[in-house]
């Protein structure tokens, strides 16, 4: 059986003052994941499976009802990082039964799981005018960081408040942060394959120096065409048009004429791996 331990939280180059972190330690075993976790908790991913899933699996992941055919991907459901995050969050309530517990965002994008946490009196940080109101958090409160992680500024705020951090950030996400940090130290611009408003991408961008976020191949093709002066598909975008298109998806002071000379690629882990690889290949062919 695993147990929860209170340990210093790594700073990940954010400058945090080592707030406390509730983590899991297992008694042994192996896993193909970066961090093996075995926890006995109230969370069971099987609860979220339905009869329709069973039917699809029994019929080669495809079934037809009337004139509608439904196909199921062979890799589906909660990934191990999600299982891990929810298990740690559930265990946190057991570890701190009388403490006030907050969470900075939805633990995962699943209404049933999030409702269960609300029933366990895990409260959302309130948002006003698009800004999180961390003033509701008091010294000594417990704050859960979700599977997607949290931005550097949020971690610094919580560190200064001397709260107890329950860090459920997926290890695959922290690997991306480490890559982005290397880009920053090497004075590379990070091209992030993701959605600029997604919590994970917001967190990843906060670890970057210069960055631009592209959602798909169309957007990265636009970027490459700008770099090549319209030679790729003839769009011949102006600097003004470029900045208008990516006004919510670039770092402060971003200059496409200067900041796209040397770049590295990172991704939001929920994006398609194959598309990220295609984006990286296109950039390497057109930029160098």
Language-model features, listed with the residues they occupy:
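The feature marks the mature, well-folded catalytic cores of soluble enzymes
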Residues: 2-11, 17-288
